[in-house]
């Protein structure tokens, strides 16, 4: 059975989840990256994307994720169509990798951006990368160059970050600088080790 030792790593758009995943990895945690799996599956499905959404969403053999993202965030039918195609494939790959990680009998992370929204993963514990919504919006605009309205629309297409914070087993606060974030990540890893060693 998959997910026995899994901890879901989640957050919101522009909360710094990728940075946290890298820092936790440097601190010895093993990470399965759902986004990377999704990108690989999407690129391998460029023909399907071309047939279902049009030629303009494929550059050569790769899917133009930026263009497709703009469509998905503005068209709910297209979003559901893509999700119903991708999600079972992503889940199957994550499950396969999870079974392999479970064989080490030590906690590991599965980086799942829409963990709470999808409800597709039977993972008991979670850690959320948190920043207050206004800072999340500010960082997203700075990173992506979208208008405030477009940025808000994308952020609000996901569950509110405060709600995710409430549901999480642990919270990593990313509202400070990199040094603060490094400390938060180190403390989280120590908590996991302490909890796991207690169980042993």
UniProtKB/Swiss-Prot annotation:
- The EC number(s) attached to this protein equal 2.7.1.24
Instruction: Identify the SUPFAM superfamilies for this entry.
Output: P-loop containing nucleoside triphosphate hydrolases (SSF52540)
Query: What residue stretches are annotated with the DPCK domain?
Result: 6-200
**Residues reported in the UniProt entry to bind ATP:** 14-19
Q: For this UniProt entry, what's an example GO CC term? A: cytoplasm
Pfam families in the record, alphabetically?
A: CoaE
Job of this protein: Catalyzes the phosphorylation of the 3'-hydroxyl group of dephosphocoenzyme A to form coenzyme A.
Please identify the protein, giving its name as recorded: Dephospho-CoA kinase
Organism this protein belongs to: Sulfurimonas denitrificans (strain ATCC 33889 / DSM 1251)
